[in-house]
Amino acid sequence: MSTDDNSNNNSSIMVDASDLSMMQLSDSFFPTGMYSMSNGLEAIFYSGKKMKTEELRELIATLLQYQIGPADCTALGNAYEHASKFNLPELLEVDRAIFSMKLVQEIRDASIRSGTQLVRCIRSFSDNRILRQYDDAIRNGAAFGPYPVALAVAANAFLIPKRKAALIMLYSFSVSIVGAALRLGMLQHFDGQKVIDQLKPQILNVIKENISRPLEGMWQFAPSIDITQISHERMNSKMFIT
């Protein structure tokens, strides 16, 4: 399509503040620490294993399919629905459920740190009621503040649709691991972008499968990855928080 055609159709393109908010929350500049996590990749690197680009893609795909999708994405979907209805008690139930499902302490602590930081940052410039109530619950010890729930509350406050909120989470998660691989010297920038591009269909499919899953159907099962993440937890010196 020509430049003239594009300019003639500008009036039909609907862009609003929620699109900018989506970019804001997914940006590495936003202070959640999401891009300082390797999710166990650093432990693999220091074990001496040589990982090919395709193996890295398969690792992220496994994490999306068996951990982040059925657990975090499910929690986000349920939390978003409760936040949109200002239902704090049900929101806190999701908070407790996803907290209890994160078996590795380092992963659990990182999720809480990111989620709490996200809520408090947004509260500093937003007076959304359910966001304020959730932040108060975290401060009072009635909630933990795991990232999927915090992101759902933040997305609701910014009028970001539920599925786009899930995109933020899965994209940030995938990029954090690719970024860790780059910083560890495991692959080059062009290869990293190729991996992200190859993951797009799976990210969309994982959201489709899990965003409307009921809370009682939430699950995760990736024992070998859990073991790797535990080994990172026990490392004395590390570059990444997970």
Language-model regions, residue ranges each:
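Glycine/small-residue-rich interface belts in oligomeric ring/scaffold proteins
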Residues: 22-86
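Internal, conserved structured core segments that host functional sites
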Residues: 73, 78, 85-156
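Long, compositionally biased
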Residues: 2-4, 15, 77-99, 219-225, ...
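A short glycine/serine-rich beta->alpha loop
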Residues: 22-31, 60-66, 100-107, 135-141, ...
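Charged, compositionally biased N-terminal leader segments and the immediate start
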Residues: 1-22
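C-terminal auxiliary extensions adjacent to catalytic cores
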Residues: 49, 169-242
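A contiguous pocket-lining binding segment that forms or flanks enzyme active sites
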Residues: 140-185
